[in-house]
Amino acid sequence: MMGSMVSNGYLLLFTCWFLFVFGLMTIFNFVEIPLYVDGDVSPIRSYYPCILILTCTVVFFVWLFFNWLGLKYFRHSPSAMRR
């Protein structure tokens, strides 16, 4: 069980870092993401996909922290100590 938890943790860490690095590469135009509006190239070229990637990464870390905190509170609650 502990081995799968460690591998899932590394998978989560590498995925988040990949999304962060890809988002930064998109901001600085190292990666071009075509965004088309009515068949034309949008004047705001890769702004929205970049913001979406970075925002989702931050929201995911906040969600992960609060889930971890909830599990800690549940594990260390007095009712869990009696088991």
Swiss-Prot record:
Gene Ontology CC entries for this record: glycosylphosphatidylinositol-N-acetylglucosaminyltransferase (GPI-GnT) complex
A UniProt-annotated Pfam family: PIG-Y
A GO biological process held by the record: GPI anchor biosynthetic process
Protein name: Uncharacterized protein C227.19c
Organism: Schizosaccharomyces pombe (strain 972 / ATCC 24843) (Fission yeast)
